[in-house]
Amino acid sequence: MIFVTVGTHHQPFARLLDALGDSGLENLVVQHGPGRPPANVARCADYLPFEEMLACFREADAVITHAGVGSILCATREGHTPLVVPRRHDLGEHVDDHQVELTRALEGRGSVVGVWDTARIPELLEAAPPRRPAVEPVEPELCAAVRSSLAQSSDA
């Protein structure tokens, strides 16, 4: 299963969702936000509860994500080297280019595979590094507190 998340940002991410629809990829589970999901999905939802998102990261064979810090951290914690498609300001996908900057920085460290041409997603998936064992957070209490805070803010 390939898990795809566009995060919780209010602007749609049609560029990524359309590319997935054109990709020929199968067995996609897509969290699509306010955008319209591609037709070739096994399962989709506009938003998922945090625990369900974590389960998707755990169960996925591969992860494709926007360049949200939380999504990238969840993917890497589960041993994935995620394909990261940064939202771009010039395309009206975000308010600035911090996702482009983050993707470049993490790609330079080998932590993610930056997707600069969405038509290349299938070949980048094929070439992506194999999944590593999942890692436990260094400070589980801190992570639990952050999770709790995020869950409370999403319930509001």
Predicted regions and their residues:
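Short acidic-hydrophobic, aromatic-tinged amphipathic segments that line or gate anion-handling sites
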Residues: 44-47, 111-120
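A donor-sugar binding/catalytic signature common to diverse glycosyltransferases
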Residues: 53-92
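Residues at secondary-structure transition points
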Residues: 11, 48-54, 58, 66, ...
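Catalytic binding pocket for nucleotide-activated donors in carbohydrate/polymer assembly enzymes
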Residues: 81-116
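Donor-nucleotide binding loops and adjacent catalytic segments primarily
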Residues: 1-59
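Conserved catalytic or regulatory cores that recognize and/or transform ribose-phosphate-containing ligands
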Residues: 1, 27-32, 62, 99, ...
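C-terminal amphipathic helix plus adjacent low-complexity
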Residues: 123-156
